[in-house]
Amino acid sequence: MKKVFIVLGIVLILLGGFYFLWSNPELGQNVGNSVTAFFTDLFEGKYVPYNKDFEINTLKVSNCDYYYNKLTEDQQKMYTAVAISVKNLEQMAKVRAYQNNVDDDIVKDAAVAMEAFFADHPEVFYVDLQYEVYTVKSVFGKDIEIKLKYTSEDKNKIKAQVVEISKKIDEILSSVESHKSDIEKEIEIHDKLCDKIKYYEYTDINSIPLDMHSVYGALVKGEAVCDGMSKSYQILLDRANIENILVVGKIEELHAWNLVKIENEWYNVDITSDKSIKGEDTFTIHSYFNVTDDVIQSTHTFSNKELLPEATGTKYNYYTYKNYFIDSNDNFNDKLQKIISSSKDSNILEFSVNKNIKDVPDKMISSMQSNKNTGYLTENLTRVSYYNILNSYVIKKIK
């Protein structure tokens, strides 16, 4: 007898320390492609061992096995099958002789495997969240079928969308010179992506269009919410041969950002928070560029911290690397003036300060008044309008 479990959305559960990544509608609308799970004795000629060189489509993501390596062996088999099915644009997934006979466990394993796959593969954007899991008793365990719904029944349309994304990726990366260091590439990709994407404003989280969660919405339509932005950064860094991971957690609602590896040290980057200052679309900031776990955890909560590498690097924090960090009261004025001088061609001034420095706004005003930095002062040169994010300050030039 065949049993069916209709999954309308991936339920947020904790299984072996792994939170389902897209359980919230803001993160969960645009998962992957067909799931097809099968072993070597099924579908002769289609089974291929999964590895990080396995290509789903022409977008050719290579850093794509981080979460795969966190799965159990059975979950890895499902994940491998998902990858093969997506590559072939197939709808029905099948697993022969799955060893776990408990239906609830099978459904959970499928969800965990799928979420790991989608977190590793930002290039997969064309399957609806709703899917069905079927189980059938067999001599060697249970056979499993997973049926997914594509966002389009037209395979040629999906392939055309992949081509559109590929062109946008090439446009962004065309000016990122290969001889540059990884940190310079990372900054340039961050800034170019922020320039091209607008944060999608919504009033009802359940009504966000599927595209706004995907690389297609971000790169082709120019709008996205957090996961669409983070997946786009993920795929661009991957193409630049910079190792990175998609991360899920919370600010107030579920949220996505990236972990990026530079010179063997990991850093957090939240491109959404660097782009989505409310009402400000004219500039990009770097308050959440290459920050440590300790720093980002003052505003963010990790959902799956135990699965992730520790991000403790400080050398390539944006403000440290650019020498936009003021470390003491004694050199505040001199350092601020150097930062202002080096930022003269920018429409904003941004820097960070040692957390022990107090009365930063007053010190800014005093320094700007003394040095006639009138382009940042308001109200008869007695006030400065600024954003304070973490330990960074962002001031928009007014003239």
Predicted features along the sequence, with ranges:
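Secondary-structure boundary elements
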Residues: 157-218
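N-terminal accessory/pre-domain segments preceding catalytic cores
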Residues: 5-180, 296-399
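N-terminal hydrophobic targeting signals that begin at the initiator methionine
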Residues: 1-2
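A short, highly charged nucleic-acid-interacting micro-segment common to nuclease
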Residues: 215-229
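Loop/turn elements at helix/coil->beta-strand transitions in domains of secreted/extracellular proteins
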Residues: 181-187, 195, 240-244, 263-265, ...
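Hydrophobic/aromatic-rich core segments of domains that either
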Residues: 228-294
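Alpha-helix capping and helix-loop boundary segments enriched in small/acidic/polar residues
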Residues: 81-83, 220-224, 246-248
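Solvent-exposed loop/turn segments at secondary-structure junctions
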Residues: 195-199, 204, 225-226, 251-254, ...
